[in-house]
Amino acid sequence: MDSNTTTSFQDILQRMSKMQLESSSVDLNGMITQFERLKIYRDSLGESVMRMGDLHSLQNRNATWRDELSQKFEEIRWLIAECRNILTKTENSFEQITFLQALQLLLEVESEIRTFSFQLI
């Protein structure tokens, strides 16, 4: 895994955890949870690609991995929409910077997951 991406995840999660958005902390906590799950999924998918010997065991063990992959792309799209929504509403520069970076990270992670998944197909 790219250590910069991992650091970016940790940085964004830390900053989000310090925020109090006007909407609700439940929404923000949900986003944080999804970011954490997305990071774990991306890391595990990348590790499977690195250990190509595990490719067949991954496919045999988890016949629904394509469904999971589709679900992760849906989660990414939802997170992107939420980040954009927050960006249109906030005037706080700290929040703007955090969510712009989160948006950029989501696009990078989406690209990484697509690359990993093509290697697994």
Curated annotation (Swiss-Prot):
<dbReference type="InterPro" id="IPR000968">
    <property type="entry name" value="Flu_NS2"/>
</dbReference>
<comment type="function">
    <text>Mediates the nuclear export of encapsidated genomic RNAs (ribonucleoproteins, RNPs). Acts as an adapter between viral RNPs complexes and the nuclear export machinery of the cell. Possesses no intrinsic RNA-binding activity, but includes a C-terminal M1-binding domain. This domain is believed to allow recognition of RNPs bound to the protein M1.</text>
</comment>
<keyword id="KW-0946">Virion</keyword>
<dbReference type="GO" id="GO:0044423">
    <property type="term" value="C:virion component"/>
</dbReference>
<dbReference type="Pfam" id="PF00601">
    <property type="entry name" value="Flu_NS2"/>
</dbReference>
<keyword id="KW-0813">Transport</keyword>
<comment type="similarity">
    <text>Belongs to the influenza viruses NEP family.</text>
</comment>
<protein>
    <recommendedName>
        <fullName>Nuclear export protein</fullName>
    </recommendedName>
</protein>
<keyword id="KW-0945">Host-virus interaction</keyword>
<dbReference type="GO" id="GO:0039675">
    <property type="term" value="P:exit of virus from host cell nucleus through nuclear pore"/>
</dbReference>
<feature type="short sequence motif" description="Nuclear export signal">
    <location>
        <begin position="85"/>
        <end position="94"/>
    </location>
</feature>
<dbReference type="GO" id="GO:0042025">
    <property type="term" value="C:host cell nucleus"/>
</dbReference>
<comment type="subunit">
    <text>Interacts with protein M1. May interact with host nucleoporin RAB/HRB and exportin XPO1/CRM1.</text>
</comment>
<keyword id="KW-1048">Host nucleus</keyword>
<feature type="short sequence motif" description="Nuclear export signal">
    <location>
        <begin position="12"/>
        <end position="21"/>
    </location>
</feature>
